[in-house]
């Protein structure tokens, strides 16, 4: 009889204790995008699902997106931008909805995914000579505006010549801007010399 009473009380208590969850002292709660909302606390962001469960814990590497007049991280096609600092230079990559890094931070800038593609600035290192006295390679860096797939592979180069860049924090204090924009799934516009636009059609 005593065991039955204890079991009965446990059945009553468990649903009550498990039915509510509070997340306190939040600075901001975003609207839902793809059934996930960003929440901010003490300078870090996390993601909750539609029943208020934290599915990605608070972290400081999530990249915010401008939505109207407000900035907050979003998932777009199951990818969210992240940022990592290496030698005081920002590199961008992506996580999936489990919080796993699926595209390692490697781009000098990157955009959200749209129709299975995203714009990014891919960094290329060119070894042009070798300093025999110092036993060091002489290298130059440039970046290309590319269209990547959801695995981070560059599918198309929108500016094949690239843009020379000095990979130093004193010269690269902010991420370079992405000048291209997506017009449709297979059509992109790239701003070249004299601020003129070039339309580029890529393979589906």
State the predicted function of each range.
Residues 1-23:
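Bacterial Sec-dependent N-terminal signal peptides
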Residues 21-204:
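Residue-level detector of conserved, function-critical positions
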